């Protein structure tokens, strides 16, 4: 009986490993934290392929740049790192503005510390196609607004987020995000899986 149970557990574990081995994900997490009296908000960005952190940007670094966090990313040339650094700095500026906007929506003073988070990414199925894309924002550690599974509409959790939703609908932001998640995100994931094929 014990041997049968052990074999069943091993078989279940192998099934989980095989299922997981065929699926992969690319995720980015961005966070901005206001620091009254200390200058601009702190901004950090990290990227993961599956459960492996592969890039990081920290606005408080001596020379803020997108940096490799996985050995296999060291294969990328200087043009890649310059481009990714510029993208991260663009996110940093945009995020700081969004943090100020959220503070105004919630009638909060600039004197306190506030946090804005953004998470997005794509999951690839074992067939190499998009399994799901996702994008969501949180303010002060609570859900704020999220792109729905259809990648066309938004869920806004409160009145402040409704303002953002209306602005984004008018600007066609969902369409741009959908194009990124279905296109660039998946292409990037395939590239990173190739670069890290020995360890991922």
From Swiss-Prot:
Its main location: membrane. Residues 22-200 are extracellular. SUPFAM superfamilies: MHC antigen-recognition domain. Disulfide bonds join 122-185. Residues 112-200 are annotated as: Alpha-2. Pfam families: MHC_I. The keyword Glycoprotein applies. This is H-2 class I histocompatibility antigen, Q9 alpha chain. Heterodimer of an alpha chain and a beta chain (beta-2-microglobulin). Residues 22-111 are annotated as: Alpha-1. It is a single-pass type I membrane protein. Involved in the presentation of foreign antigens to the immune system.
């Amino acid at each position: 009986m014990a041997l049968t149970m052990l074999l069943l557990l091993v078989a279940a574990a192998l099934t989980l490993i095989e299922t997981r081995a065929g699926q992969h994900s690319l995720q980015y997490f961005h966070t901005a934290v206001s620091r009254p009296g200390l200058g601009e908000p702190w901004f950090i960005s990290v990227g993961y392929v599956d459960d492996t952190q592969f890039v990081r940007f920290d606005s408080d670094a001596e020379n803020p740049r997108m940096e490799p966090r996985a050995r296999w990313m060291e294969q990328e040339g200087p043009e890649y790192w310059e481009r990714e650094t510029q993208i991260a700095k663009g996110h940093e500026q945009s995020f700081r503005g969004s943090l100020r906007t959220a503070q105004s929506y919630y009638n909060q003073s600039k004197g306190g510390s506030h946090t804005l988070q953004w998470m997005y990414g794509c999951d690839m199925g074992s067939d190499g196609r998009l399994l799901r894309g996702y994008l969501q924002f949180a303010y002060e550690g609570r859900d704020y607004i999220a792109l729905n599974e259809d990648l066309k509409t938004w869920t806004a959790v409160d009145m402040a987020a409704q303002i953002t939703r209306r602005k984004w609908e008018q600007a066609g932001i969902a369409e741009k995000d959908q194009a990124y998640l279905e296109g660039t995100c998946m292409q990037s994931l395939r590239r990173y899986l190739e670069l890290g094929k020995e360890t991922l």
